[in-house]
Amino acid sequence: MAPPNGTANDVTTTNGSYTNIVGRKTTMHKLIEEHGSILMPGVQDALSAAVVEKTGFHAAFASGYSVSAAMLGLPDFGLLTTTEVVEATRRITAAAPNLCIIVDGDTGGGGPLNVQRFIRELISAGAKGVFLEDQVWPKKCGHMRGKAVVPAEEHALKIAAAREAIGDSDFFLVARTDARAPHGLEEGIRRANMYREAGADATFVEAPADIGELKEVSSKTKGLRIANMIEGGKTPLHTPEEFKELGFHLIAHSLTAVYATARALVNIMKILKEKGTTRDDLDQMATFSEFNELISLESWYEAESKFKSFTPKAES
């Protein structure tokens, strides 16, 4: 498939295939090359990852906002630790082994050496990539107010450190900048290109305000580009086909799953509280058999059947 509009020459070969900044193809590069643009739902835990995989998606995003909500019941306010992120990643990748899992790494856990340790732990946990952002710690969700960013050169060093830690691993490095809100779009674009030069496989200018800003990001940034669709957020919602035409390659729906889960739980709990039973509202839930299929219950019965009895060999 030919590269979509806006792809920079420095990430394509002469036949239109994708490589990373050091000339290797990661799983994510191959997916983008095959499909042109990749729709990547957010996941918050092992169950949501299993749903995404069984629905037929190729990739998923372990969103910090979503993981913080599911694991801690807390907002995306810099409260989630890197240790907790790695723990959540292990569970997510185990539940969805065929998904390309990209992890929200927030600011990377400290300085360049902390970033390197974090990257190695994510690789060990089965992740296929990470987003690293340039916010001041403690960070906030990219669509919340009150954000600040570190000097661009400071984050570029983290990206360079991450690139070194990745080595030959199948791991996709995304550099995110939140500079649009505090300093304007031009600064966000400048930073994205600097982070690309430092070693990022793709760049992500968070929270463009409209189609005009999306077009400007596409025309002025190099390499592969990420867009983030937040229902109720600052960037208007667009389809993957529309983003492909705009020159974006990876489209994250970071919070769709956690928002849908929250709404469904609130609704059914209200029903249970008001009625004292769910007898007349079973259509609001998965059935017993549907859920067992979702969590692959039968495969566990099959595994269990191998160990029903043991017969020792007769002595000669």
Question: Where are each of the predicted segments found?
Answer:
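Extended, intrinsically disordered, low-complexity segments
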Residues: 3-22, 256-316
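Alpha/beta enzyme core
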Residues: 17-253, 259-263, 267-270, 306-316
